[in-house]
Amino acid sequence: MPESILELDIHGMTRVQAKTAIDAKLRRAGSGVYRLRIIHGYHSGTALRDMIRREYTGHPKVKRIEIGLNMGVTDLVLREY
């Protein structure tokens, strides 16, 4: 399934810009999408990472948040695959 994982790079965005971009991607995610991988980076601080984890924990479209081995990436799991 080519569309099963969507990626969104929010490097350099403000928290407001990043939230707007993430919300738009979540709205457009089709039924074949089970994961939104957000690339936020970590060398410039944790503001974006912290915002993602705070704002999307408990979001109606997000089943859970996964933190991988790469500290600059957070996955929003939309459904189980």
Give, region by region, the residue ranges found by the protein language model.
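Long, charged, low-complexity intrinsically disordered regions
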Residues: 1-81
